[in-house]
Design a protein with these regions (language model features):
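Short, conserved aromatic-histidine micro-motifs
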Residues: 120-128, 171-173, 178, 197-198
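Short, charged low-complexity intrinsically disordered segments located at boundaries
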Residues: 105-106, 184-187
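Secondary-structure boundary/capping residues
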Residues: 55, 84, 164, 199-200
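Juxtamembrane boundary at the C-terminal end of a transmembrane helix
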Residues: 113, 190-200
Length: 200
């Protein structure tokens, strides 16, 4: 179920994002649909991941999100020239996204080599799906984290606000810190479930 929700959300979001040649436009109904399905899916996935492992497993998944976010920001500032979605988030660039892919994959490849902790998600992924498949899955999760960030920016622009709340001054609000994890958590849960059912 999580995988179906994630896939449907991802397809609809990017279809809307790139279909419009004269600027981004999305309906309130589509935003509401994505919010009421994806936020609960992310929460349930978080609980399921805790049941499968412990805080190390969950933290390792969130490190993918945070690593992609930080890497995309600094790589975008250093080399960004081509904007990804200027109507939604003018500062996001394709160069930043590529930098995020490379840094996250290299970091977790090194983690796999030097860290023997089995509860780390990427170690579990590489051990059970193979290194090449693991790299492909990591690239997909980075793409989903960027999509989640863009989705939250889209919602804010739709309602005409800059920050989602005042809870974390200077960071755009609590939701701004968690937006990228919303699609990643269901995707991670789906991947682990697939490995358990198909690979094992």
């Amino acid at each position: 179920m999580n995988g179906c929700v994630m896939l449907a959300w991802f397809v609809i979001f990017f279809a809307e994002l790139f279909h419009r040649e004269n600027g981004f436009k999305v309906s309130q109904r589509q935003c509401l649909w994505s919010a009421v399905t994806f936020v609960p899916a992310a929460y349930l996935s978080l609980l399921w991941l805790f049941e499968q492992g412990d805080w190390v497993l969950v933290l390792s998944v969130l490190l993918i999100v945070w690593g992609a976010d930080i890497s995309a920001y600094f790589c975008g500032r250093a080399w960004g020239k081509h904007r990804m979605a200027p109507a939604i988030s003018p500062k996001k660039t394709f160069e930043g996204a590529i930098g995020a892919y490379v840094i996250v994959i290299v970091f977790f490849a090194l983690t796999y080599v030097f860290c023997v902790q089995q509860n780390v998600f990427t170690n579990y992924l590489f051990d059970n799906a193979g290194f090449l498949w693991g790299v492909g899955v990591l690239a997909m999760l980075v793409a989903l984290s960027i999509a989640g960030d863009l989705w939250e920016s889209m919602l804010k622009r739709l309602v005409g606000i800059k920050d989602s709340s005042n809870l974390l001054p200077g960071h755009g609000g609590f939701f701004d810190r968690m937006d990228a994890s919303l699609p990643v958590l269901p995707a991670t849960a789906f991947i682990m479930l697939w490995i358990q059912l198909i690979v094992h």
